[in-house]
C-alpha cells in the first residue's frame, strides 16, 4: 500500500471511531415502504423514536426499531457508559435499494408479467445533536 493511501485509510479508520451507526442489509421490503418509516424518526431523540416505532402499524417499523436499539448499543459500547435520556438523536438515516429478485407471473395469451421482489439496505447513525444541526 502506498503512503498516501495508507494515510487516507488511517484517517477513515479514526473517523469511524467517532461515528455510531448500525446497518441492516437485504431487508425483504421495498425501499419505498421502508423510507416512510425512516422519515418518521429522522432527527428525533432516540427514546421518542423508539416509542414512535413501537406503536407504528407498519411492518418495517419493527425492523427499524431493532436497528435503532443496535445503534444505541454500539454508542454505549464505544463510550463505555449508558446513554442518558435526551442525549442521543437519530442524526442520519437512509434507505438504499438492494438486490431485486425477478419472478414471472403467468398472464393471458401465453405472456408472462415480471414481478420485482425488491429489497433494501438501511443505515442509521446516532449521536449528540450539535448547534450546527439545529440551525439547518
Swiss-Prot record:
What is one GO cellular-component annotation here? cytosolic large ribosomal subunit
| Coiled-coil region | none
Question: Cross-referenced SUPFAM superfamilies, in alphabetical order?
Answer: Ribosomal protein L22
Q: Pfam families, per this entry?
A: Ribosomal_L22
GO MF annotations, alphabetized? rRNA binding; structural constituent of ribosome
Q: Where is the signal peptide?
A: none
Origin, by domain of life? Bacteria
Stated family: Belongs to the universal ribosomal protein uL22 family.
**Cited CDD domains:** Ribosomal_L22 (cd00336)
Q: What job does the chain carry out?
A: This protein binds specifically to 23S rRNA; its binding is stimulated by other ribosomal proteins, e.g. L4, L17, and L20. It is important during the early stages of 50S assembly. It makes multiple contacts with different domains of the 23S rRNA in the assembled 50S subunit and ribosome. The globular domain of the protein is located near the polypeptide exit tunnel on the outside of the subunit, while an extended beta-hairpin is found that lines the wall of the exit tunnel in the center of the 70S ribosome.
Q: Name one GO biological process term.
A: translation
Q: What is this protein called?
A: Large ribosomal subunit protein uL22
Q: How does it assemble?
A: Part of the 50S ribosomal subunit.
Check the record and name the HAMAP family matching this protein: Ribosomal_uL22_B
Q: Which UniProt keywords apply?
A: Ribonucleoprotein, Ribosomal protein, RNA-binding, rRNA-binding
Q: Which PANTHER family match?
A: CHLOROPLAST 50S RIBOSOMAL PROTEIN L22-RELATED, LARGE RIBOSOMAL SUBUNIT PROTEIN UL22M
Amino acid at each position: 500500500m502506498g503512503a498516501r493511501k495508507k494515510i487516507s485509510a488511517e484517517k477513515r479508520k479514526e473517523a469511524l471511531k467517532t461515528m455510531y451507526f448500525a446497518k441492516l442489509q437485504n431487508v425483504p421490503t421495498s425501499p419505498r415502504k421502508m423510507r416512510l418509516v425512516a422519515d418518521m424518526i429522522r432527527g428525533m431523540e432516540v427514546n421518542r423514536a423508539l416509542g414512535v416505532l413501537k406503536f407504528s402499524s407498519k411492518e418495517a417499523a419493527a425492523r427499524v426499531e431493532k436497528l435503532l436499539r443496535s445503534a444505541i448499543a454500539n454508542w454505549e459500547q464505544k463510550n463505555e457508559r449508558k446513554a442518558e435520556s435526551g442525549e442521543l438523536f437519530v442524526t442520519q438515516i437512509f434507505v438504499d435499494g438492494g438486490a431485486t429478485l425477478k419472478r414471472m407471473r403467468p398472464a393471458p395469451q401465453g405472456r408472462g408479467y415480471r414481478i420485482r421482489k425488491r429489497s433494501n439496505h438501511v443505515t442509521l447513525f446516532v449521536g449528540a445533536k450539535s448547534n450546527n444541526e439545529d440551525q439547518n
